[in-house]
Amino acid sequence: MEQLKKNKERLKIITDSIEQGIKDLFESDKYKQYLRTMSRFHRYSVNNTLLIAMQRPDATHIAGFSNWKNQFGRHVRKGERGIQIIAPTPYKKKIDAVKVDPDTKAPILDQNGNAVMEEVEIKIPMFRVVSVFDVSQTEGRPLPEIVSDLTGDVQQYDTFMEALQRSSPVPVSIEPIALTTDGYFSLTEQSITIRAGMSEVQTMCAAVHEIAHAKLHNYVIANAEAEQTQEITKKDQRTKEVEAESIAYAVCQYYGIETAENSFGYIAGWSKGKDLEELRASLETINQTASELIDNIDRHFMQLCKEHGMENALKNAEMSLEDDYDMIDGIINNGQKNVEEKLTEHRPSVLQQLQTTNNSEYKRTALKCAERER
């Protein structure tokens, strides 16, 4: 009981720090740092992403004390302070429940018409505060090197763009349009148009931005899918731009694409007057959409590599750390992975994996994406 009380107290302290962190987050520099952290840990929950950004914003690879030692041959340096995050620690409990027919799902009754009871085991959700450490806090066996610059030839760019197009909910085309915009999502046409003639990186940035709009702000599809009694609440233009630009920034950061210096200077004005739940909801939307888009791009990219006979590039690529709860000491996941609270390790993107197989002479740093005018 004493341990349970201590855990509740630690959870209360860390939850309070999260709430204060959200309030303080919407200053341009802090917000950009949060998005950079989110890009490295895009499957983490908003809470844990924020906790990492607050405690060690430059973290890249995280694991528990024992896992660093046992799985990676590394040890945490003496005196290093752990990063506190929230981890799920569900426990099982047996209870009496009404027995139901496995086919009809109706309660089974005895000869007197009373419900038959049976003992069943249920899982009770619970969370606790755990400490993890970044690779920079450890010493020992080297981890596989991750290439961070966007490099490669035109074939790689074309493959990536095709993966991006397959990840879009609407068709994407590249056409000559006015120089005043990099691209746009059309509600009436249900399509995305990107301006022709831009650099490869600028084209990718614009495409991600507009795909974010198509995924989040497509009210034609939303109204069609909603029940007649439901009313779709449309977001204001500033909120839509904050969400799309944040997603584009995080996704591009994940793939090592150097975007234009976006100060997010407008973020403080946008967040002013919004309550904590509104701000948290926007962060959840940005987090979930960016994570889904990254996963879809990776999946389509790997499929295209197979179609193009590039299996060896993927086969030879080394993943840096495993992608599940096992990186956290004492966590039992029972094969279950909760999307919202998943504490996964950062892994090299499929684009980064291919970089080591391309011509080194062709290596270049990413071009800066011109700041979007809207």
Where are the regions that the model predicts?
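N-terminal accessory/interface modules of nucleic-acid-binding and processing proteins
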Residues: M1-Y325, I331, R364, C369-E373
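Long, low-complexity, intrinsically disordered extramembrane tails
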Residues: N333-K337, R347
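Short acidic, low-complexity intrinsically disordered linear motifs used
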Residues: T344-E373
